[in-house]
Amino acid sequence: MSAQIQFNAKMSIQEYLAFEEKSAVKHEFAAGQAFAMAGASERHNRISGNLFAHLHAVCKASQCTPYISDMRVKIDQVIYYPDVMVACDAADRDPYLKTAPCLVVEVLSPATERIDRGEKLYNYRQIVELNAYVLISQNEIRVDVYRHSGVQWLFESYALLSDAVHLDCPKTVLSLAEIYERIEFPNTQAQVGLS
C-alpha cells in the first residue's frame, strides 16, 4: 500500500463508492473518510508483480483468482485496496470489490507500515474466509505472516532468501528468493535473483 492523504469530509459507504467511481485517484475508506493513495516505488511494484505472477500460475487450475492493487476488499464499513489478494468464493461476485478473500498481502512502506500492522491487521482478521495476511518489507528481506489456524491467529516471520512461506489458500509454497527476485536493497550492491 502507498502513502495516504486524508479527506476531512465524513461520508457514507454509498457516498464513498459513488465518489470513487468518478475519481481519477484511488481512495481507501475507513471511519467514514476517504484516504487518497499515493504512488508506489519500483521495489514495491516488483515485489507485488513477483507475487502476483506466482499466484496467477498457481490459481490457473482452480476457482481462485488473484488480484493486484486495483481490486478493493470490503470489511463491514471499511474498504481497502490490498497490494495482492486471492479470492476463491464463487458467491463473491461483485466486479469491483471482494468480501471473502482467503489471502491478503500488503507490501510495506515507511509511510504505511503502522496502518498495515495495526488498523488493517485488525480489520482483515474480521474476514471469516481469510487464511493468511502477509506483510512484505520492501527495504529488507522480511516477510511476516499472520495465519489463521482455525482457532486463533498465529504469527510467523521469515528473513532468509532460503526461507519459504507455505500457504493453504491457494495451496502453494512461496520462496523469499522468488518474492524478492530482481530487487535491489538500499545500502548493498546485491540484487536478488541476478548473478
Place the predicted regions along the sequence by residue.
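Gly/Pro/Ser/Thr-rich low-complexity, intrinsically disordered segments predominantly at protein N-termini
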Residues: 1-195
